[in-house]
Amino acid sequence: MERAVPLAVPLGQTEVFQALQRLHMTIFSQSVSPCGKFLAAGNNYGQIAIFSLSSALSSEAKEESKKPVVTFQAHDGPVYSMVSTDRHLLSAGDGEVKAWLWAEMLKKGCKELWRRQPPYRTSLEVPEINALLLVPKENSLILAGGDCQLHTMDLETGTFTRVLRGHTDYIHCLALRERSPEVLSGGEDGAVRLWDLRTAKEVQTIEVYKHEECSRPHNGRWIGCLATDSDWMVCGGGPALTLWHLRSSTPTTIFPIRAPQKHVTFYQDLILSAGQGRCVNQWQLSGELKAQVPGSSPGLLSLSLNQQPAAPECKVLTAAGNSCRVDVFTNLGYRAFSLSF
């Protein structure tokens, strides 16, 4: 007579809750530490996890090396965006941005240094902050999101110094033209707007969906991602992923991908994009698809390139989105492994 296989011991309530959290997790944002050896990831539960890239990439790495060094509750709602200065990690959620000291987080002391809320129109308004952008030359931070405005904060004093108005719906993404003091913003209204930081005025508007070759009405007009490289911009979302010549406001390359893209970046002579679907796409500027590299998440929301010169051994691409995992690509050709909350 066969022996009955004993049932698994029921998990405790905490373990069940954590397993359900991981099952329904979305990772919205990532940021590399100033030393290049650590990666912060922010999720839909308001948690930030700090991973040790140097440990995970080591030849002696174990499964435990791919788990967070520390995880802490940073916001009440999702952590939509993060950036790092030479000392701080800045994180944004619903209505406010917070600062954390990298040195303290790595010692597992996760106490916020400060928090700031932009001057919203009413005290009842708590719009999400979808995008953060550092402007190193003026030591400032630009925040944008659900109130359809760009707010500039002086990082030295913590005061808000300017508001840029023009979008008619919420803003998804920001990019900096480093050679000129200009910022690009893309939003739900289907427009990419260029702002001159010297005059605090809008100097150019590209309504992408109005260009027939880019328009995809069934996907909507929203702009979910953009990046710039001097005179060139690439953007996507509802409309097709498109490379634009900024001076002439003309689309030069339409990239042949149907799925809406949520993140895009220039890398050397390539453009990297990700969105609906599990692949990181590598494009030639001509529009040719060089490679599609599958990851472990069904959809991707965030790409991060670690190019910190202080840690060349940690030079990796990381991708995250609709799962509890952060995929690590040690070269662009394949996924080496995944970090996990």
UniProtKB/Swiss-Prot annotation:
It is found in: Nucleus; Nucleus speckle. InterPro entries: THOC6 (IPR042626), WD40/YVTN_repeat-like_dom_sf (IPR015943), WD40_repeat_CS (IPR019775), WD40_repeat_dom_sf (IPR036322), WD40_rpt (IPR001680). Gene3D superfamilies: YVTN repeat-like/Quinoprotein amine dehydrogenase. One of its GO terms (biological process) is central nervous system development. It holds the Pfam family WD40. Coiled coil: none annotated. WD repeats lie at residues 22-61, 74-112, 124-165, 166-205, 215-254, 256-293, 295-339. The keyword Transport applies. SMART domains: WD40. SUPFAM superfamilies: WD40 repeat-like. The modification Phosphoserine is found at residue 180. PROSITE patterns: WD_REPEATS_1, WD_REPEATS_2, WD_REPEATS_REGION. One of its GO terms (cellular component) is nuclear body. GO terms for molecular function: RNA binding. Keywords: Apoptosis, Developmental protein, Disease variant, Intellectual disability, mRNA processing, mRNA splicing, mRNA transport, Nucleus, Phosphoprotein, Repeat, RNA-binding, Transport, WD repeat. Component of the THO subcomplex of the TREX complex which is thought to couple mRNA transcription, processing and nuclear export, and which specifically associates with spliced mRNA and not with unspliced pre-mRNA. Plays a key structural role in the oligomerization of the THO-DDX39B complex. (Microbial infection) The TREX complex is essential for the export of Kaposi's sarcoma-associated herpesvirus (KSHV) intronless mRNAs and infectious virus production. It is linked to Beaulieu-Boycott-Innes syndrome: An autosomal recessive neurodevelopmental disorder characterized by delayed development, moderate intellectual disability, and dysmorphic facial features. Other developmental anomalies, such as cardiac and renal defects, may also occur. Belongs to the WD repeat THOC6 family. Component of the THO subcomplex, which is composed of THOC1, THOC2, THOC3, THOC5, THOC6 and THOC7. The THO subcomplex interacts with DDX39B to form the THO-DDX39B complex which multimerizes into a 28-subunit tetrameric assembly. Component of the transcription/export (TREX) complex at least composed of ALYREF/THOC4, DDX39B, SARNP/CIP29, CHTOP and the THO subcomplex; in the complex interacts with THOC5; together with THOC5 and THOC7, plays a key structural role in the oligomerization of the THO-DDX39B complex. TREX seems to have a dynamic structure involving ATP-dependent remodeling. This is THO complex subunit 6. It comes from Homo sapiens (Human).
